[in-house]
Amino acid sequence: MLPMITGFINYGQQTLRAARYIGQGFMITLSHTNRLPVTIQYPYEKLITSERFRGRIHFEFDKCIACEVCVRVCPIDLPVVDWKLETNIRKKRLLNYSIDFGICIFCGNCVEYCPTNCLSMTEEYEFSTYDRHELNYNQIALGRLPMSVIDDYTIRTILNSPQRING
């Protein structure tokens, strides 16, 4: 009779333990119901990038002194800097500046080490194209500032998306 009673007690303990484990899992599932969705519908919704996001490089032609520090610190020697030495004033004059974003690894070394801060990172990250030669940006294309995701009325960002109603 005693083994039968201990068997019932063990069975009851195992049943309670299983119910507790199922309850814990259910509570975790319920705790996730009040969260916002993580997945976004990309072309129509975009995440707002952080301040330190390393997107397309913005170039200010007037600030550049053609020192070529950006070329020396680039791990793949990417920026192409064409300059001409002005003998009468003994300074370099920048003629052309270009970066091929098909090759760029967006490490940010050129921006970090530029002595005149003529390079900066923007929040633009959409470079899709059918021709790889379109990714070679000259100083005119690098000088254009991109439209901010927050200011673009055609894109619904996470900040202005409708919140879930608890109820």
From Swiss-Prot:
PROSITE patterns per record: 4FE4S_FER_1, 4FE4S_FER_2
Binding site for [4Fe-4S] cluster 1: C64, C67, C70, C114
GO biological process: photosynthesis, light reaction
Residues in 4Fe-4S ferredoxin-type domain copies: 55-84, 95-124
Essential cofactor(s): [4Fe-4S] cluster
GO-annotated cellular components: chloroplast thylakoid membrane
Localization per Swiss-Prot or TrEMBL: Plastid, Chloroplast thylakoid membrane
Enzyme Commission (EC) number: 7.1.1.-
Record keywords: 4Fe-4S, Chloroplast, Iron, Iron-sulfur, Membrane, Metal-binding, NAD, NADP, Plastid, Plastoquinone, Quinone, Repeat, Thylakoid, Translocase
Binding sites annotated in the UniProt record for [4Fe-4S] cluster 2: C74, C104, C107, C110
Cofactor binding description: Binds 2 [4Fe-4S] clusters per subunit.
Molecular function per GO: 4 iron, 4 sulfur cluster binding; iron ion binding; NADH dehydrogenase (ubiquinone) activity; quinone binding
Catalytic activity, as annotated: a plastoquinone + NADH + (n+1) H(+)(in) = a plastoquinol + NAD(+) + n H(+)(out); a plastoquinone + NADPH + (n+1) H(+)(in) = a plastoquinol + NADP(+) + n H(+)(out)
Membrane topology qualifier: Peripheral membrane protein
Domain of life: Eukaryota
Quaternary context: NDH is composed of at least 16 different subunits, 5 of which are encoded in the nucleus.
Similarity comment: Belongs to the complex I 23 kDa subunit family.
Biological function: NDH shuttles electrons from NAD(P)H:plastoquinone, via FMN and iron-sulfur (Fe-S) centers, to quinones in the photosynthetic chain and possibly in a chloroplast respiratory chain. The immediate electron acceptor for the enzyme in this species is believed to be plastoquinone. Couples the redox reaction to proton translocation, and thus conserves the redox energy in a proton gradient.
Protein's name in the database: NAD(P)H-quinone oxidoreductase subunit I, chloroplastic
Protein source organism: Nasturtium officinale (Watercress)
